[in-house]
Amino acid sequence: MAEQTYSWAYSLVDSSQVSTFLISILLIVYGSFRSLNMDFENQDKEKDSNSSSGSFNGNSTNNSIQTIDSTQALFLPIGASVSLLVMFFFFDSVQVVFTICTAVLATIAFAFLLLPMCQYLTRPCSPQNKISFGCCGRFTAAELLSFSLSVMLVLIWVLTGHWLLMDALAMGLCVAMIAFVRLPSLKVSCLLLSGLLIYDVFWVFFSAYIFNSNVMVKVATQPADNPLDVLSRKLHLGPNVGRDVPRLSLPGKLVFPSSTGSHFSMLGIGDIVMPGLLLCFVLRYDNYKKQASGDSCGAPGPANISGRMQKVSYFHCTLIGYFVGLLTATVASRIHRAAQPALLYLVPFTLLPLLTMAYLKGDLRRMWSEPFHSKSSSSRFLEV
């Protein structure tokens, strides 16, 4: 009886839960530092391009980076709700198109994930000169290698439907979204995460009362028809051509099998990406403070704040909050034996410590509205 009562405690050390914790944290940390490195590279390119004209614009950004403003933060949960309803009611009609679009995006994202490794492998034997492909653009050998490997992985996933390949593609999507999407201020971060918390709670806890089914869980776990199977049926290629391929579980989540093989743990990529955007923001702000004369950047903190407290980075504080929130969400799901809206736990455990620390350090006003308004220096070192 006691073993059954505390079975949730034993499940926390199961391989599936440990893998979920480690991978989600590693993806957030890696994606945040990829984002920071992209900022450094963009600054260097701007300096090089403007050195001949004698001017430098410190506020320019890369066109490939998408910054979320307040309006987008408010309407993103509404758009996500509409997309969720479309997938719930019309999944059979849109599943093939959605699967193909997801495969294309996953290919690009996983190529981005592999790019640093491919650059390391090709550096000794290949110069960084770009090869022209006409209207398709110019690419380095590392970019071509990473894209080729990504295409191969997606093709194998389509043929096998293996969960490990799906996880790899989901990891690429997580890292790419954290690296290319930016939160400009703490105000936008609070608007976005608060709206998504309400979105997550509503669709997990209350959608069953309206639609007689848990919309979030059904959409997240519903497999899609394999495009090869659909193509073989449309072209009447016969029963033995393309009919033995499996249905595909789309890479909108990370799944890991338990040590007993009896079940899979699941974590949606939104529960990694959205807190990851906040972690990316605070990492950039930590670096900004180091560039702008260290601790003198923000308004002076209260006199009772110790020097050790002043040295604690916002990134460390928020990352610990993410871990505690994810742990709490896991415990809640095990105790109640039902799906839980992870953002219900992740948002308070990340935002509240961050807001408290920013207030105590005297940085809250700056972080709230204009955290990066001044010209940054060329310092490239951050202790984490």
Swiss-Prot record:
GO terms for molecular function: aspartic endopeptidase activity, intramembrane cleaving; protein homodimerization activity. The active site is at 200, 271. One of its GO terms (biological process) is T cell receptor signaling pathway. Changing residue 271 to A: Loss of intramembrane-cleaving activity toward the simian foamy virus envelope glycoprotein gp130. Does not affect complex glycosylation pattern of cellular glycoproteins. Keywords: Endoplasmic reticulum, Golgi apparatus, Hydrolase, Membrane, Protease, Transmembrane, Transmembrane helix. It is an enzyme of class 3 (hydrolase). InterPro entries: Peptidase_A22B_SPP, Preselin/SPP. It is found in: Endoplasmic reticulum membrane; Golgi apparatus; Membrane. GO terms for cellular component: cytoplasmic side of endoplasmic reticulum membrane; endoplasmic reticulum-Golgi intermediate compartment membrane; Golgi apparatus; Golgi-associated vesicle membrane; intracellular membrane-bounded organelle; lumenal side of endoplasmic reticulum membrane; membrane; plasma membrane. The keyword Hydrolase applies. Residues 30-74, 119-136, 186-190, 284-311, 361-384 are cytoplasmic. Not glycosylated. Its EC number is 3.4.23.-. The chain crosses the membrane at residues 9-29, 75-95, 98-118, 137-159, 165-185, 191-211, 263-283, 312-332, 340-360. A motif (PAL) lies at residues 341-343. Widely expressed. Expressed in the brain. Monomer. Homodimer. Interacts with STIM1 (via the transmembrane region and the SOAR/CAD domain); the interaction promotes the binding of STIM1 to ORAI1. Interacts with the simian foamy virus envelope glycoprotein gp130 and its processed leader peptide gp18LP; preferentially interacts with the envelope glycoprotein gp130. Intramembrane-cleaving aspartic protease (I-CLiP) that cleaves type II membrane protein substrates in or close to their luminal transmembrane domain boundaries. Acts like a sheddase by mediating the proteolytic release and secretion of active site-containing ectodomains of glycan-modifiying glycosidase and glycosyltransferase enzymes such as MGAT5, B4GAT1 and B4GALT1. The first transmembrane domain may act as a type I signal anchor. The catalytic loops is exposed toward the lumen. The PAL motif is required for normal active site conformation. The catalytic domains embedded in the membrane are in the opposite orientation to that of the presenilin protein family. This is Signal peptide peptidase-like 3. The lineage of its organism: Eukaryota, Metazoa, Chordata, Craniata, Vertebrata. The gene is SPPL3.
